Structures are given as C-alpha cells and as structure tokens.
C-alpha cells in the first residue's frame, strides 16, 4: 500500500506526538456541499450513491478538495448491515430510513442471516478499495459501523424514533429476544468492520447514536456489552500499522470510564460533555475526539474561532485529541464556515504541541 503522507489522525488516536491537532468532521461528505448534492442527483437516490463505488469515492473525496482535513471517512450508511439482513430498507421523504419488515419477536431474529461482508456488503468493500486507491496516501481512511443497540433501534422500531417505546417494550418484556438480536448484530458488525480493515480502512469507528436514551444499567447490558464484544473481535493491526478503534455514544458522557475499559483506543464526545473533565477522567487510557456543537458553524467566523480556542484550551497541552464536531455537520451550514473551523484548529493548536 502507498506510504501515508499525513498520519496525524492515527498518531493522535494512539496518543503519540503530533505537530498540530488533527481535525475531521462527522458527515463531512454531505448535503452542506453543493458538489455533493450534484453527485447525489446523478446517482438518483441515497442508496444508489452508497452502492456505486466510483460515486461513493467521489463524495468521500469532495471535502478533502475543499479543506485540509486529516482523515477521510467512508461514504456509507449505518443501515447497510440491517439492509443486508433482508429487512427491506427504503427512504421515506421527510421521514428518513424505514424498514418494510421490522423485527418483532425472537422468531424474526432467528430468521435473520449474518451477512457475508464480501457478498451482500461487497459494494462497501469495493468503495473502501476505490477510495484507498484514489486517496494515494494523502490521509487515512476511516471505516465505520453503527453499534448493535443503535442498529437494533431502527430494526425493531421500523425506522427512526423519538421515544423508542417499541424497542424498550422488547427490552423490558422480552429481553431474551433483544439479546439474541444484539448478539447477531455484534457478530455481523465485527465481520463487517474486519472486512473494511482488510479492504483498506486504516481506523474504524462505532457509532452508538442512540445509546444515550438508556439508563446506566441498561446501557451497560444492551449497548456497551455488545460494543465490547466487537472491539474484542477486531483486527487491531493491518499493513504493518495499528488500526485504532473509536467508540462514540451520543449522550454517553456519564459513562466514559466504562467505555474506556473496552480496549478501544479513543472515545468520541458529543458537545454536552466538557472535554477538560473528560480528559481528567479517562485521558490516561484513551484519546478523545470532539467536540464542538455542530450548530456553532452557523456563527460568524470570529465566534467559531473563539469556540475552537476554548475547546483546545479545555483539552490542554499534549497528545490524544482529535478535533471534531460533537455530531454530524448540519446540511444548511455555509461551506466556508466549515473551512474557518478546520483552518482554526490547525492554526490555534500548534502551541499545545510544542
């Protein structure tokens, strides 16, 4: 494989010295960029964009042409795994993702296959290989998956949810069925991420978008336990380099200590967690990624710079910080504000690495 020209992101995740704090943005390939909208229109719909390796590569690279980002992230969706299990994923205008055959009971779980990542999910691996080739070693490529709990919420609810009553009903009334589903998902996700690593992903991230809706005890049993299983099953070295793993539970700031015990390399923080406090609690064990409020990108440039400076000062001197937003970038943010953000991170962080 090509020699990596900029390995800041990988080094920071392993808490090794860097010259400036690396930065990337969740959903950096997305609807805030006019060029993304043009490519998506060309693809026809969202899943057609994900399933076309050339177009998925194009949208992955678009933000890197605009901004000096320190990592690329595979353009895909967390729902590729349940889709490959045969649940019939489709997108409803204004409602987001839906499934034609939601999981309602243990019998439904028993029927679900564990998808072969090189077969049913082969289009994702093709995209990874294509992106790695086109990146030419400029920056590392991040692979990712949703967490078992987060994937299960969509599979049981039949789509997005605000109250999560359907899956919580299963959790409390039929926990055996939910554990069977989560176990199958943990196996599927570990295979899926390992296939991404073999195809060329140089780091991986597990997005637990909905872990924060659980009580502390339920989070341990129904979310963290299964992420821990995945981390235990991952390839941690490939192509002569360590492959760092980041866990991100949105709304999970109160559980950082437990998350840091999983053996992951880094934890993602949302904007509701104070980064100085997070570093005091777990900074001797894991790197931290985050954590500016994505809505700050609506602010004037001077205010964005001020917020970047505040978060950098909060983390302080030394290694182990990857700058990011606390969740995905909003689709109506001015692209030049994202540029202000990225440039400010590099310029203002230099003093913390001397």
From Swiss-Prot:
Alphabetical list of HAMAP family matching this protein: URO_D
Quaternary structure, from the entry: Homodimer.
Species per Swiss-Prot/TrEMBL record: Escherichia coli O157:H7
Pfam families, sorted: URO-D
Pathway(s) annotated for this protein in UniProt: Porphyrin-containing compound metabolism; protoporphyrin-IX biosynthesis; coproporphyrinogen-III from 5-aminolevulinate: step 4/4
MF-aspect GO terms: uroporphyrinogen decarboxylase activity
Upper lineage: Bacteria, Pseudomonadati, Pseudomonadota, Gammaproteobacteria, Enterobacterales
Function: Catalyzes the decarboxylation of four acetate groups of uroporphyrinogen-III to yield coproporphyrinogen-III.
Protein name: Uroporphyrinogen decarboxylase
CDD domains linked to this entry: URO-D (cd00717)
Record flagged with keyword Cytoplasm: yes
Gene of this entry: hemE
Listed GO CC annotations: cytosol
EC id: 4.1.1.37
Keywords, alphabetical: Cytoplasm, Decarboxylase, Lyase, Porphyrin biosynthesis
Residues reported in the UniProt entry to bind substrate: 27-31, 46, 77, 154, 209, 327
């Amino acid at each position: 494989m090509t020699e990596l020209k900029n390995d800041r992101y990988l080094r920071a995740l392993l808490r090794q010295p860097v010259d400036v704090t690396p930065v990337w943005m969740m959903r950096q390939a997305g609807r805030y960029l006019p060029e993304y909208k043009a490519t998506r229109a060309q693809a026809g719909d969202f899943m057609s964009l994900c399933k076309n390796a050339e177009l998925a590569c194009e949208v992955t690279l678009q933000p890197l042409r605009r901004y000096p980002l320190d990592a690329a992230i595979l353009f895909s969706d967390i729902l590729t795994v349940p889709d490959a299990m045969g649940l019939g994923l489709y997108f409803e205008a204004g409602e987001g993702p839906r499934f034609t055959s939601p999981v309602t009971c243990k019998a439904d779980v028993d029927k679900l296959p564990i998808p072969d990542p090189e077969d049913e999910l082969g289009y994702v691996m093709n995209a990874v290989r294509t992106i790695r080739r086109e990146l030419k070693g400029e920056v590392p490529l991040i692979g990712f998956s949703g967490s078992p709990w987060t994937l299960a919420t969509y599979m049981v609810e039949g789509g997005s949810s605000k109250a999560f009553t359907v899956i919580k009903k299963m959790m409390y009334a039929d926990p055996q069925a939910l554990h069977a589903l989560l176990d199958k998902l943990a196996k599927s996700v570990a295979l899926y991420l390992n296939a991404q690593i073999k195809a060329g992903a140089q780091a991986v991230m597990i997005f637990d978008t909905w872990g924060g809706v659980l009580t502390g005890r339920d989070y341990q049993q129904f979310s963290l336990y299964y992420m821990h299983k995945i981390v235990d099953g991952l390839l941690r070295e490939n192509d002569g380099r360590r492959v760092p793993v980041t866990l991100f539970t949105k709304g999970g700031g109160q559980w950082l200590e437990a998350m840091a015990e999983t053996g992951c390399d880094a934890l993602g923080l949302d904007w509701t967690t104070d980064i100085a406090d997070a570093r005091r609690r777990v900074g001797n064990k894991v790197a931290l990624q985050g954590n500016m409020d994505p809505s700050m990108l609506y602010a004037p440039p001077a205010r964005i710079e001020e917020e970047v400076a505040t978060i950098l000062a909060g983390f302080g001197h030394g290694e182990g910080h990857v700058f990011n937003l606390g969740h995905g970038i909003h689709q109506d943010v001015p692209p030049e504000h994202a540029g202000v953000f990225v440039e400010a991170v590099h310029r203002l962080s230099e003093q913390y690495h001397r």
